[in-house]
């Protein structure tokens, strides 16, 4: 899968750049709320009230942004341009 089609990176990068609030639910049901400071292939750094949490992606169940994030993949670009 190419970087252009990586939906999770698109969502996290847009949330980081736009400083959007996210709610991240862990597999055990615990919700974490905050803003994405940084992320890589395995982790997300989340900031809330001047505290940072390093969250491992394998522990995440769901990510819910505070507002809709428009994601574009090669398929949707082709459909729009097509």
UniProtKB/Swiss-Prot annotation:
GO terms for biological process: regulation of DNA-templated transcription; regulation of RNA stability; regulation of translation, ncRNA-mediated. GO terms for cellular component: cytosol. One of its GO terms (molecular function) is RNA binding. Pfam families: Hfq. It comes from the Bacteria. The keyword NADP does not apply. Residues 9-69 form the Sm domain. PROSITE patterns: SM (PS52002). Keywords: RNA-binding, Stress response. The keyword RNA-binding applies. Homohexamer. Belongs to the Hfq family. RNA chaperone that binds small regulatory RNA (sRNAs) and mRNAs to facilitate mRNA translational regulation in response to envelope stress, environmental stress and changes in metabolite concentrations. Also binds with high specificity to tRNAs. NCBIfam families: Hfq, PRK00395.1. This is RNA-binding protein Hfq. It comes from Leptospira borgpetersenii serovar Hardjo-bovis (strain JB197). The lineage of its organism: Bacteria, Pseudomonadati, Spirochaetota, Spirochaetia, Leptospirales.
């Amino acid at each position: 899968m190419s970087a252009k089609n990586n939906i999770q990176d698109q969502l996290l990068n847009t949330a980081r750049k736009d400083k959007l609030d996210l709610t991240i639910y862990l597999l055990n049901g615990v919700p974490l709320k905050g803003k994405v400071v940084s992320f890589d292939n395995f982790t997300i750094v989340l900031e809330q009230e001047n505290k940072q949490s390093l969250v491992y992606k394998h522990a995440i169940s769901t990510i819910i942004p505070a507002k809709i994030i428009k994601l574009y993949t090669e398929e949707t670009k082709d459909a729009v341009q097509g």
